[in-house]
Swiss-Prot record:
Disulfide bonds: none
Function description: Involved in the binding of tRNA to the ribosomes.
UniProt cross-references to Gene3D superfamilies, sorted A to Z: Ribosomal protein S10 domain
Source species taxonomy: Archaea, Methanobacteriati, Methanobacteriota, Methanomada group, Methanococci
Listed name of the protein: Small ribosomal subunit protein uS10
GO molecular function, one term: structural constituent of ribosome
PROSITE patterns for this protein: RIBOSOMAL_S10
A single BP term in Gene Ontology: translation
Keyword Chloroplast set for record: no
Assembly information from the UniProt record: Part of the 30S ribosomal subunit.
Keyword vocabulary terms for this entry: Ribonucleoprotein, Ribosomal protein
UniProt xrefs under PANTHER family: 30S RIBOSOMAL PROTEIN S10 FAMILY MEMBER
SUPFAM superfamilies, sorted: Ribosomal protein S10 (SSF54999)
Length: 102
């Protein structure tokens, strides 16, 4: 049977966990084997910018960070389960990638 690897990433971990819970509920309802959601390391993207635009005055900086949270779910990919997963409402902040494997 084919397996599907579902990769999810988002900057909002609560919305990401909500989508993972929906996929987990679908797997339990249809009775397919599932492993995950496996949390991958959170990537912190940092940008430091100088507050003063003209270069004069004291050197003060703004530090901005954005954290990207990732999850991986492996699931058996029968047709009924995949149709249910495709109908899940995904928030705009969550990116999803589905890869089918033999």
């Amino acid at each position: 049977m084919q397996k599907a690897r579902i990769k999810l990433s988002s900057t909002q971990h609560t919305e990401l966990d909500g989508v993972c819970d929906q996929i987990k509920a679908i797997a339990e309802k249809t009775g397919v084997d599932m492993s995950g959601p496996i949390p991958l390391p959170t990537k912190a993207l940092k940008v430091t910018t100088r507050k003063s635009t003209d270069g004069e005055g004291s050197s003060s900086f703004d530090r901005w960070t954005m954290r990207v949270h990732k999850r991986v779910i492996d699931i058996e990919a029968d047709e009924r389960t995949m149709k249910h997963i495709m109908k899940v409402r995904i928030p705009d902040t969550v990116q999803i990638e589905i890869e089918l494997r033999n």
